[in-house]
């Protein structure tokens, strides 16, 4: 299987998000990379499902709460930007203050 660098990045984010979800299920608080991965994966999959950029910008800030992350993680992540493939092309989705 020959994957492009972009496809490899998407696969890595998806795998990291799967690990993060399992940790959440066990009650483990997420670290920085896990929080980024789970929100990024939510955006990529939402775009694939046909949601709009505006919907994902709003919903992306509701994926995780401060209580689900280690202390200080919410303050470390000011914005998350993800290039996602929508039915009408690739667009940049920015989520401001993604962990509230």
Swiss-Prot record:
Its main location: cytoplasm. Keywords: Cytoplasm, Hydrolase. GO terms for cellular component: cytoplasm. It is found in: Cytoplasm. It comes from Rhodopseudomonas palustris (strain BisB5). GO terms for biological process: urea catabolic process. It catalyses: urea + 2 H2O + H(+) = hydrogencarbonate + 2 NH4(+). It is an enzyme of class 3 (hydrolase). HAMAP family: Urease_gamma. Heterotrimer of UreA (gamma), UreB (beta) and UreC (alpha) subunits. Three heterotrimers associate to form the active enzyme. Pathway: Nitrogen metabolism; urea degradation; CO(2) and NH(3) from urea (urease route): step 1/1. CDD domains: Urease_gamma. Its EC number is 3.5.1.5. Belongs to the urease gamma subunit family. This is Urease subunit gamma. GO terms for molecular function: nickel cation binding; urease activity. Pfam families: Urease_gamma.
């Amino acid at each position: 299987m020959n994957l492009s660098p972009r496809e490899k990045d998407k696969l890595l984010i998806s795998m990291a998000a799967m690990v993060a979800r399992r940790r959440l299920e066990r009650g483990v608080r997420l670290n920085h990379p896990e929080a980024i991965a789970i929100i990024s994966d939510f955006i990529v999959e939402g775009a694939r499902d046909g949601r709009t950029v505006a919907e994902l910008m709003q919903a992306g800030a509701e994926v995780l709460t401060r209580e689900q992350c280690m202390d200080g993680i919410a303050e470390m992540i000011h914005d998350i930007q993800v290039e996602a493939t929508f039915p009408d092309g690739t667009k940049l989705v920015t989520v401001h203050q993604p962990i509230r």
